[in-house]
């Protein structure tokens, strides 16, 4: 990292620190009091249902919209007061292209290069070859997936210390998604770079994320190590007559079917559900947790303290 870009006499330990972040909209939606940290050298997945506040959070980090409360530090710098220095060290991929559609790939480099003191033309060229992007191709003629790859090439070609990606795998085929996950894993391997990316494809998280931040209804449900999140819940399946009183008290979410139910229970509460004969208990996937904590039949009976998955 360029020492000149850091506060004098300090070296940050966190790539990103968000404290008490709040944003109110006239529509009534509020992103409420979100707090989390991302250390250097790790990948954080940002998850939640549509409309949960993931894109709002990313826009706030990038100062694309104003916050009502809270503080954001990027690489030890105040994201608002030190915006220019911060953005020199960010790599950004949004869910839609930020380039003018009649611009060529070559012109995209010419407009991007002056914004980044550490721009590496040879590295950008290498990514263009890797992604199969011709310099004379117009942005409007690129598929959504290829436009994402162009933004990624720009993001990776100026020694950005933090990548912020909004649904980067949307529009990519399976092979391209695997390639992207490999690139991100390599990117953080030196311990000096970090990634935060939002996604609705939980398989991507299970493959490469170290940390998970889960937002639902504008509130932080959990932020911490992905492994702890995965270990914190169990999926309990049973027939229509097997929904015991103990299970109803313990569950934090449920979806019922004609043939039975899927219930989400914190691992620590499994011994208290009673009547387990006939019930199938298994590890809950990230997708299971998101699905059942946002199901139409989400119960308020169980312990649903946000941010506490122990």
Task: Outline where the language-model segments fall.
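A general boundary/transition motif marking the beginning of the first structured unit of a protein
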Residues: 9, 100, 115, 172, ...
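C-terminal coupling/interaction segments
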Residues: 2-5, 253-310
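Extreme N-terminus of proteins, especially the signal/transit-peptide cleavage junction
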Residues: 2-14
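Short loop/turn segments at beta->alpha junctions
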Residues: 104, 225, 282-285
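ABC transporter nucleotide-binding domain
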Residues: 180-267
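Short, surface-exposed beta-strand/loop "edge" segments at domain boundaries and coil↔beta transitions
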Residues: 163-168, 242-246, 269-274, 288
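ABC transporter nucleotide-binding domains
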Residues: 13-18, 23-203, 207-216
